[in-house]
Amino acid sequence: MVNNYIRDLSENRLISVKGTTNRTMSYNLTPKGIKEKMSLLISYNLETTSLYMDAKKEFAKRLQKIYEEGIHSAVLFGAGETAEIIYNASQSLKLEIIGIVDNDPAKQEKLFGNLIIKAPHCIEEIKPDGVIIASVGRQDEIYKQIEMLTAKGIAVKKIGSALNGLNGN
C-alpha cells in the first residue's frame, strides 16, 4: 500500500525517488510537492480554525443557557484544551468564570487566562454559583467527585462536547 502511495506521488511529480535498495532509497519533495504541502497545510489550518470557532460558538450558547438558569459565577473544573475554549467563549458573556480547578497537581498554581489553577478542594472557598465540568472525557468521574457540592447550594453542570448534543444536567 505504501508503495502505491509513493508511486502516485512520484508519478504526480510531488516527490523524487532516488536509490536502488531499501537502505539507499531517499524520498524528497519536489518544488511542486512543496507547493502542494503548503496548500494542504493552509487548508488544514483553515479547517482547524473553523472547528475552533464553531466549538466556541456552541459553548457560548451553552454558557448563556447556564447563566439564564441563575448561575452567574462559575468555576471551571479541568484545565485542558476544552476549558481554554470555554474560558474564551465566556469572555463576551455575562457569566463570570471566577476560578479554575484541576485534579492534576502539575497544573495547579499555574496561570490560566487571568486565573490561578487551584485544587478541587478550593471550590467552596472561591464561592461560585456553580461548577462547569470542562473535561469532555471525564465528565461522569468528575461529577461523582463533586456532586456533594449541590447539597451546599453550588450547582454542578456538565457542559458536554461542543460537537455533540447538549449534555448538561
Which stretches of residues belong to each language-model region?
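Hydrophobic, well-ordered beta-alpha structural blocks that scaffold small-molecule cofactor pockets
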Residues: 1-14, 20-169
